[in-house]
Amino acid sequence: MSLYSDRTAEDHLCDRGRPTACLFGDQVEYEAELGLDFWPEAPRMRRIHLDLFTDDRSLAFSVDAPLRKPALAVDQRLKFSAGLREVRRRGAKVVIGPVDVDDLDRLAASHDLVVVTAGNNSLAGLFERDQVRSVHSEPQRSLFMMNVHGYDMAARPEHREGVFSFLPGTLEMFWVPFHDKDVGESRSLVVEATPGGRADRFGDVTSADEGLEVLKAVVDELFPHESAFLRPARPTSPVTWIKGQVVPVVRRPVAVLPSGRHVLGLGDAVVLNDPLAGQGANNATRMARFFAEELAGHDGPFTAPWLAERFDEWWEHGRYTNDFSNGLLAPLTEEQRTVMLAASRREDVGEQLWEGFNDPSSLFPWFFDAAATREFLARRNVGRLDVLRYKLGVGANLLTQKASRLVKRPVGGTATP
């Protein structure tokens, strides 16, 4: 086996920050089974705390529930660097240098199979867009990510685990326990802003310090209860930040080269989701595991039709990842809000909801189909009167928050609640 990379192990360590790439339970266990769990000191995420806000910055409700298996986010610069060294240690040939279509053609002639897992500029357009399986043609969120340390954990102990802050229609923000290359335990902050909305302010950011200042301003305005936690934070390094947009796409898994030979695509090269559902690295890991088992058990040649059939077989389960990711990009339905509201009162419902990050198929159909949602809640003895009681509690809480802000207004002046 040969692995071709345009960067050395040291190049990866010196690279800019990479996406957060939080792996959930089954994928963490699979890496461990492969002997790739090199960072036992990295913080594990065992719970997720979600705050759902209204447009006037009021907290509607919170969901706090355990994950069935711990999640783990390790700096990809560490993982890619260690991975290259480990592949070589296990006997594979590692070749450093750029690879273009002509190189792929040459490699396809001398190897049983060539697998492409990167979509760099020289290979752009190699895999054809699947018009049926691709839902979006434009970015659905403006993205910003940075790693920070020096935050005030005492101000918000919830951040010992994962925290999600949602303002539907405006901003989703993820505060992820993270193992950073330079400082170790830190937090990776992932911002998903609705394009053109109040939180879409990162397009002109040119540095980590500038990005953090913009982020603090957004948090002060939209999630002020997080301000004390974030105020003393600083970037883990000048390069651990990313901004941009993603157009979710599914591509055909087999590309035909000019010679007529073919290559297989895996991971983001063929299935690229918006990071909102945290499925990029998880989806790539599931796909790699499936194809590793299929390829190892196949005695014949790896023909293009056979590879396409295997992808279709994988898609029977893999499509749930896309449906989950695209579903979260859409506005929350009334039934989904009801599930989340029930989860704020029932930890078992929250645990089932969080399991979707580990196994998206576990959310179907009950989280995306109204009738199935009602059946799901009924099986857990959450009836209409329970939901009504939950909603009345939320309403009373919102009124209390508004009254509190009115009381805090200065006499003889004006203030914005």
Identify the function of each model-found stretch.
Residues 40-130:
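Conserved N-terminal helical subregion
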Residues 49-50, 232-250:
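Flavin (FAD/FMN) cofactor-binding core of flavoprotein oxidoreductases
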Residues 127-163:
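Central beta-strand plus flanking loop segment that forms part of the substrate or channel wall
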Residues 167-241:
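Conserved FAD/dinucleotide-binding core of flavoprotein oxidoreductases
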Residues 277, 293-417:
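C-terminal helical "tail/cap" subdomain of flavin- and related membrane-associated enzymes
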Residues 7-55:
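N-terminal FAD cofactor-binding segment of flavoenzymes
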Residues 1-7:
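N-terminal Rossmann-like FAD-binding beta1-loop-alpha1 element of flavoenzymes
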Residues 244-323:
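Conserved mid-domain beta->alpha element of the FAD-binding
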